[in-house]
A protein has these predicted regions:
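Sequence/structural signature of outer-membrane beta-barrel proteins
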Residues: 117-121, 155-157, 187-188, 212, ...
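Extracellular/periplasm-exposed beta-strand and loop segments of Gram-negative cell-envelope proteins
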Residues: 122-126, 136, 159-164, 181-193, ...
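Carboxylate/His-rich catalytic cores and anion/metal-binding grooves
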Residues: 139-178, 301-305
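Surface-exposed coil loops of outer-membrane beta-barrel proteins
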Residues: 170-191, 195-196, 219-298, 310-339, ...
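N-terminal periplasmic/intermembrane-space "pro-region" immediately following the signal or transit peptide
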Residues: 20-129, 135-142
């Protein structure tokens, strides 16, 4: 059945500046600071891996920019002991007690025909009215950080036509691998009633010494430079409990020679994923374990360039499977050892040309092992399971005097199956035959907001001015072309005798979505103060 959906969305955000600010993923504030980095006015705090705790922006008070006089948030100093307490363990840490309040941020949407939404955390935006409310606070003291920022969501979840389910639940996804309950936990609809949900959101406890950090909590992770469709991880799904450790963005100097060779960043984490209530009836497989590794390097000899590589591994929930967090050779065929496995990796580059306000980026993702192994298999067919996101951002100056600036963003994403699978079996980057819930948490994909198996073309233009931002978005995408390909794999293209014509029965039924979306953010400029206020 061919359907074209047009979605119009507008959101209003109350946000609070600061010269030194720590911002939530994809918030209005973080997007604005990222725009400043495109102009070379501020240095990005993270190269590849970022959460709310990592997104710490340090803007000089003397830097002139559109929102310079706005109140974007203030860090309060409750106790300052920097003069009385000095030791190696506090070097590089907050020497005293500081606090910050977040939000509240209230998001609302109304979908007239079918579910639509992306990169919205625990919120599943079904047909009808949807809303999300988040607020919180952060406390820092002597290297310790405590953040409480939960998310409360509601979906009216009105009825709409769905396809036949491939799982025990009648609301499950409409296709998968082979037998029932095999492929992905991605409900078409979360039951037949309106529902509320509480998520811990960006909540965590953390300890940081200089740039070494470790923490436990539920903060969402964003990997890579993508603005809409991150390949391996974003804030598209509900959060999950995890432990992480690593090195935040750090300058590297060769000892004695005092040569600066660039910045590095490294993070490793493990967490617990949960099945939705609308998949199978087997309670023994309700949880999976996720392991992740993220590495990045920004060479000093190529200004603005960042190279990165990421790896994730999903295994069955068993404490014994913690050993698979390290990607050594013995852990590359986990499924053969009874743990189940779904390993994926991505790598790419992000290059900012600050003098001209230009950024280009790309990320390639790989899944599964190529037939005939490495390197022969990739020499024979290098596109096996390959997915990608490519993007470009450009800053424009409309009026320096009135502080009006523009930002053009274009992103292209494709996660359709590589065509060698036409000779093998149906495939989807987000599905798996051992981790049968696929690459999901609580029924939503961990990344790639528009879904794996399709393609997206996205364009937006934002105008920043002293009172806020106005943005217009135009996009179109096919959410899951792999479903069509899966039907075609074991079929003939044309058979007049048996009345078979795949072009008429499947190609002409592809689902295409068109998005036209305005958005406005309004900023208050009352009582501008310093980033740090002493109480």
């Amino acid at each position: 059945m061919k359907r074209v959906y047009i979605a119009l969305a507008a959101s209003a955000l109350l946000f609070n500046t600061a010269v030194f600010a720590q911002e939530a993923l994809k918030s209005a504030e973080e997007n604005y600071y990222d725009f400043l980095s495109l102009q070379g006015l501020v240095k990005r705090p993270a190269l590849n891996y970022r959460t709310l705790s990592d997104s710490v922006w340090n803007v000089s008070p003397s830097t002139e920019h559109a929102w310079q006089l706005n109140n974007l948030g203030t860090t309060y100093t409750l106790l300052d002991t920097s003069d009385s307490m000095q030791n190696a363990f506090l070097d590089g840490s907050v020497n005293g007690i500081k606090a910050r309040l977040y939000g509240p941020q209230w998001y609302n949407s109304y979908n007239t025909a079918a579910p639509y939404g992306m990169n919205d955390g625990a919120l599943w935006q079904g047909k009808g009215y949807n809303t999300s409310l988040t607020a919180g606070a952060r406390l820092e003291a002597y290297g310790l950080e405590l953040t409480l920022k939960p998310q409360f969501v509601f979906s009216q979840n009105l009825d709409f036509e769905i396809m036949k389910s491939h799982s025990d639940s009648e609301y499950g996804y409409f296709w998968g691998y082979g037998t029932k309950n095999n492929g992905v936990d991605l409900p078409q609809r979360f039951g037949d009633e309106a529902f509320y949900y509480f998520d811990w959101g960006d909540t965590e406890v953390r300890y940081t010494w200089k740039n070494l950090t470790l923490g436990f909590g539920t903060q969402a992770i964003w990997l890579g430079p993508a603005q809409v469709n991150a390949i391996l991880h974003s804030n598209n799904a509900p959060t999950y409990p995890k432990f992480d450790a690593g090195l935040r963005r750090t300058e590297i100097h060769i000892p004695w020679l005092n040569w600066y060779i660039g910045d590095i960043e490294a993070r490793i984490w493990t967490g617990k994923l949960t099945e939705s209530d609308y998949y199978d009836s087997d309670e023994s497989n309700d949880n999976n374990m996720i392991h992740g590794l993220a590495l990045a390097y920004a060479p000093s000899f190529v200004p603005g360039l960042t190279l990165f590589a990421n790896r994730t591994c999903l295994v069955k929930w068993d404490w014994e499977n913690l050993k698979y967090i390290i990607p050594v050779e013995a852990n590359t065929h986990v499924g053969e050892q009874g743990a189940g496995e779904d390993q994926k990796m991505s790598f790419g580059a992000d290059w900012i040309f600050a003098p001209v306000g230009l950024e280009i980026y790309g990320e390639l993702g790989l899944d599964d092992f190529v037939p005939n192994s490495f390197p022969i298999g990739y020499i024979r067919y290098p596109l096996h399971t390959l997915v990608y996101t490519l993007g470009l951002k450009k800053a424009f100056t409309h009026s320096d005097e009135k502080k009006i600036y523009g930002e053009f963003t274009m992103e292209i994403n494709s996660t359709e199956m590589s065509q060698d699978f036409q000779l093998q079996w149906p495939y989807n980057f987000g599905f798996h035959h051992q981790i049968t819930q696929g690459y999901t948490n609580r029924g939503q994909y961990l990344a790639n907001a528009t879904g794996y198996g399709g393609n997206l073309q996205y364009i937006s233009y934002s105008v920043f001015y002293p009172k806020g931002k106005t943005m217009l978005t135009v996009a179109r995408w096919n959410p899951d072309n792999n479903y069509i390909y899966s039907v075609a794999i074991n079929s003939v293209a044309s058979d007049k005798e048996n009345n078979i014509d795949l072009n008429k029965t499947h190609f002409m039924s592809w689902k295409a979505n068109f998005i036209l979306g305005p958005a406005v953010n309004y900023s208050r400029s009352d009582s501008v103060g310093q980033a740090n206020k002493i109480l």
